[in-house]
Amino acid sequence: MLRVLQECEHVAADFSADPVHDLRVSLRRCRSLADGMIAMDPDRDWKAMKKAGKRLFQRLGALRDVQIMMEWIEKLRPAPARADAGESPALMETPAQKSEMSDGAPFAEPVTTDFGDPAAHLLLEILKGRETEQKREARAALAEFDRKQWRQWSRSLPLRAARIRPGSAVFKHLALERWTAARELHVRALRNRSQVAFHTLRIGIKRFRYIVENFLPAEHKAWSNDLKHMQDLLGEVHDLDVLWATALACHVFPDEASRKSWHAQILEERTRRINEYREKTVGPDSLWVAWRAGLPQGKQIEATATLRMKLWAKALDPDFAHSERVSRLALDLYDGLVAVGLLQFANADEARSSLQIAALLHDVGKSEGNKGHHKTSFELIRGHSNPLGWRPEYLLRAAIVARFHGGALPSRSHKTLRDLLPDELRITIQLAAILRLANAFDAVHDGHIRRVKIENSDTGKRRTNGFLRKPAKLPPNQALVIEAEGFVAGSTTAQAVAAERYLLETVLRRPVVVKAMKAAVPRGDGAEVKRIAS
């Protein structure tokens, strides 16, 4: 982030092409850092920094576009060589081949020698006029940029980013999200081959590249050259498209022959770059396949998505240890109820995961105050972007279940539930009933209820006469008995449990009884008692 302030000083000197480019690159990297951290750290400074960087970045964009077109004119239609001058360095490289960070190298303006091509000369003169105008706009934008605030962020935000180790699984999951989005843009661009599609693809690759660069050092070392080259190829395609559109709009061609000559040259350069991109990104050995191989696979995707959401919740929840305990207790209840046949789901694993996430996130709303926090939790969870590996309705279910961990009981007429299909409504209320009771078991946030168990249930299959058999279902109308380790009758926790078990009783259509869990007696001690008695 300090590099942005350094580049601001360079740009303020003369607003030439290289420092403007370097400042925009620095801003883009900071914005990409913020974009990645926002997914796991809800601190508002990330969003504020990203917004401030975006404002300056965009206001420098028009100037940068003009300067790029001037460089391309020099490359495509160079001035006639003079006998007393060697080849201009500016003509020996494309704009995208220049270094992204100049490391203090002297800044050089594009060569403005007279061109033999009248169209090139006229277009360059028009662009020089625009450059002067855009430099005034850029100077105003730079003056409005709050460097003092940026310096404060440069001290505080890197410390927050350091809490998550670079190269960790959560960053690989974030990179996979960017890879997936960019890959879809790649397929679309190769299918319709439009200018907009290739430009959007370049942006997608750029976002993937900066996540890798900022957060995955090992992958960056292996992939950086290829990622930058693919981005540069597509960037040059976009530059050529903009140059051609500008030349047409400015009516710089003196005749049809000149227009056709320009079009043919631009089309040739454009096609060559697209073909090179295709060669490296299509087929079983493509770069896309190589990049995907280094990112999470299979079940790792959903597990890492859960870890990302836990990190997000931990930053918001003032007592996340309580939420973790509630999650464990809720899963104990869920597994026991399924084992005795009182709950049945078409997709039991998904329902269990929904309950786990709802329990972990149920108190994130307390970041904005305790009053009505269950409603705030619902809004925060629902407003969170859907992590890769989860379906959108999966996160919405978790948000609704978390909404009803306290406050009013869920009903079909509630505005949050009225649009749910009958099966989804039933599942959501069942999970909310479990979470509500699990939360009551840790009502005082002290963790003295260590575990719970459905009496006479066995979460595994029992072996009888050499055969595995499922546990017997509870008979109709028989009370559900829950044993809780550390439960004390008459305590504050017992009162909370008595109040919150009602929803589960309604769902199961049977009474729920909670009692203290009996201490297990080791087998050896029991045998010793028998010998003494005899």
Q: Where would I find each of the regions flagged by the language model?
A:
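Divalent metal-dependent catalytic cores for phosphoryl transfer on phosphate-bearing substrates
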Residues: 313, 322, 334-454
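A short amphipathic beta-strand at an alpha->beta junction
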Residues: 508-523, 531
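Cationic, histidine-enriched alpha-helical/coil surfaces that engage anionic ligands
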Residues: 1-304
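Intrinsic, low-complexity polybasic segments
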Residues: 85-89, 94, 102-105, 459-466, ...
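Low-complexity, glycine/alanine/valine/leucine- and proline-rich hydrophobic stretches
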Residues: 444, 448-457, 476-512
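Short hinge/gating elements
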Residues: 208, 307-317, 414-425, 485-488
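Regulatory/sensor and coupling segments of signal-transduction and defense proteins
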Residues: 300-314, 318-321, 325-330
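Amphipathic, well-packed alpha-helical segments that form the structural scaffold of globular domains
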Residues: 2-9, 180-183, 187, 310, ...
